[in-house]
């Protein structure tokens, strides 16, 4: 029976590497998958899933108006799995449509993304995945400044932490760091020694 999975973690926890690994494992067995990502993620181009270690694949971009249920239902083949990167940028209706893909089409959906933003608030997509997912899995990484588990994302501008601003700000290692709770509230500057 198909399930809706939400695999979340702080920045730099290997979410994109994991999604690309899952896609590879299915496809190596001649089991087609559909790889999707938020159309808001433009770091390496719209419709690209790119890891920090250089792995990259094309994906179907999801925009505000995209009906993902209809998109998957209208395919000429039935994929073995739907894989979604940057799912924190999804809207409530996207998450419900992914749940329908699982329940009505019996296709597993694995969604990968951040749980909380740099203000330590839930993203809309993450909020509804936490509510509707059948399985939750935390992908772990360590704090940029110590050895504890990172559960939060710290945003830096010009080497200084920032706690206010628009929720959606696309950036990579240069702007966001995985941190533990202690270093979220009492951060070091990014130039300080670990």
From Swiss-Prot:
Reactions listed under catalytic activity: thymidine + ATP = dTMP + ADP + H(+)
What are the record's GO terms for cellular component? cytosol
Please verify whether the record's keywords include Nucleotide-binding. yes
> Which of this chain's residues are annotated to bind ATP?
9-16, 85-88
Query: Can you tell me which residues bind Zn(2+)?
Result: 143, 146, 180, 183
Q: Which InterPro entries match?
A: P-loop_NTPase (IPR027417), Thymidine_kinase (IPR001267), Thymidine_kinase_CS (IPR020633)
**Active-site positions, per UniProt?**
86
GO molecular function term, any single one: zinc ion binding
The places in or outside the cell where this protein is found are: Cytoplasm
Query: What biological-process terms (Gene Ontology) are attached?
Result: DNA biosynthetic process; thymidine metabolic process
The enzyme's first-digit EC class, named in words, is transferase
Q: Which Gene3D superfamilies match?
A: 3.30.60.20, P-loop containing nucleotide triphosphate hydrolases (3.40.50.300)
Q: Name one Pfam family in it.
A: TK
Ordered alphabetically, the record's keywords are: ATP-binding, Cytoplasm, DNA synthesis, Kinase, Metal-binding, Nucleotide-binding, Transferase, Zinc
Q: What is its EC number?
A: 2.7.1.21
| Similarity section | Belongs to the thymidine kinase family.
Q: Which NCBIfam families is this protein grouped with?
A: PRK04296.1-4 (NF003299), PRK04296.1-5 (NF003300)
Tell me the HAMAP family matching this sequence. Answer: Thymidine_kinase
- Describe its partners and assembly state: Homotetramer.
Official protein name in the record? Thymidine kinase
Originating species: Enterococcus faecalis (strain ATCC 700802 / V583)
